[in-house]
């Protein structure tokens, strides 16, 4: 399993996701631009001392990612999806992509991947 963060903005969020990736043996893929430097204290604080064990790859944009992973099955996590993540069967080589905190995944990408858009239900207070 792979996690993709598309243009993440908050270093602590990325650090926490990175720590979870280490704990689960999941690869992390970061698509630029990032809203922070990977050497910032806040990302290291969130990732604690696990960050050095993380298998992380950076890409200059989503096209760069696609060219380096042709044929990858990418699930788009979006509040706009009809299908809930529990409705699908994930494979060990699948990717789940999350968009930037302020805006989500760009609409043009969601249109391109409309068949693999999934929603993670949230309480209405979020």
Outline where the language-model segments fall:
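Post-transcriptional modification and biogenesis factors for structured RNAs
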Residues: 1-126
């Amino acid at each position: 399993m792979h996690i993709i963060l598309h243009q993440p903005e908050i270093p602590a969020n990325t650090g926490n996701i990175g720590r979870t990736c280490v704990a689960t043996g999941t690869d992390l893929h970061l698509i630029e631009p990032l809203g922070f430097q990977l050497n910032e204290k806040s990302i290291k604080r969130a990732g604690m001392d696990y960050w050095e064990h993380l298998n992380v790859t950076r890409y200059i944009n989503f096209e760069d990612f696609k060219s380096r992973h042709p044929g990858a099955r990418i699930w788009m996590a979006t509040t706009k999806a009809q299908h809930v993540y529990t409705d699908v069967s994930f494979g060990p080589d699948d990717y789940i992509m999350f968009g930037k905190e302020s805006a989500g995944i760009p609409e043009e990408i969601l249109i391109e991947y409309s068949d693999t858009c999934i929603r993670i239900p949230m309480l209405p207070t979020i």
